[in-house]
Amino acid sequence: MRVAVLSAFLSTCLATGTAAAATAEKFAGVDLSYVNEVEACGAQYRLDGKLRDPYELFAERGANLVRLRLWNDPTWTQYSNEADVTRSIERAHRAGMHVLLDFHYSDDWADPQQQRIPAAWAADIDDADKLAQHVYEYTRDVLARLNERGLLPYMVQVGNEINTQMLRADKTTGLPIDWARNAKILNAGIRAVRAAHAKDGSSPKVMLHVAQPENVEPWFAAAVEAGVGRVDYIGVSYYPKWSKLNMSQAQAALERVRKRFDTDFIVVEVSYPFTLRDAGDGAANLLGADSLLKGYPATLQGQDRFMNDVVRMTRNAGGVGVVYWEPAWVSSTCSTRWGQGSHWENATLFDFKKGNELTPAASFLRAIRAP
């Protein structure tokens, strides 16, 4: 680590007014990327037995941020493309919530295991300058089209769970990261977000997102050394299934991140099962017994306790938000490429055993925003 580089990064963050966690706006979030799709397949949501619109319901329960993923050109689905995301942003704004737009920079899922380059950019995979240009122009153009409709997001993720090399070939590990290449790509995305301005002159906030608390500090240290530009928020995924850390260890890791980089963080992906059963559909669930932490059983009460403890962990570590991943991906007649139904219905915030009634764990939304 070059101390001068780190010092310059921290000075820039301070100069742009990075707020202390104690005074920063608190974000209570829900990732609703699947809602349009499952509603088209007949999904319904209830509170006290009455049918409810999920956007309006979550806003009433305290949510002020909706996270939405964006794929470049997903020819295998009509959802999570630009047209679908535009509809979702409109719904979020009607419900009075901010939007965090999550650019995957892929035609498919992007995560630590895979960061497949979009097909339209594949010919330039070995040219970092051309890739940076693609990222800049794509990000700029999407945000410009949204801005024309008054839908510029409040916050933008430049990549999703970018623990490994971005824009790479399929069936590659992405490790070790080529940081010269990665920095060009990331900085291009950051510049494009900074260049977008709403009518009031404001620009979207910028986030970089890493999966699992134990990976955040080393990743950002390497990014700073490589010259990756400042960001407004650090995004973190925390899933006990894939993390080596329990709650107290995760808190300690995130507290170090907050202090070392003097940048607010948000847990932008977290979920927990309320049962180990499924809804009887044809899609195997991703979160099973291997996803449980001691003291948090797969029950409605266990899910509620886990989420409210995640809120406490986040606040104690200096974080400013928690976003539940896919709380509304309930079972329906829709199919994924791996089965009919949902792979997540036991970890949503709707109890399929009670007609998709809102679960008690939704209380975390008000808890994260409490004074």
Language-model segment annotations:
Residues 33-35, 71-73, 104-108, 158-163, ...:
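Active-site beta-loop-alpha junctions enriched in small/polar residues
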Residues 23-98, 104-135, 235, 241:
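N-terminal substrate-binding region of glycoside hydrolase catalytic domains
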Residues 4-16:
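Bacterial N-terminal signal peptides
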Residues 81-84, 111-231, 243-252, 335-351:
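Active-site cleft segment of glycoside hydrolase catalytic domains centered on the general acid/base Glu
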Residues 42-59, 135-145, 214-225, 304-310:
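Short, acidic/polar
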Residues 54-55, 199-205, 214-292, 308-319:
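Glycoside hydrolase catalytic-domain groove-lining segments
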Residues 43-46, 256, 275-313, 317-318, ...:
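Aromatic-rich peripheral "rim/lid" segments of glycoside hydrolase catalytic domains that contact
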Residues 28-32, 66-68, 99-103, 154-158, ...:
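Hydrophobic faces of well-ordered beta-strands that scaffold small-molecule active sites
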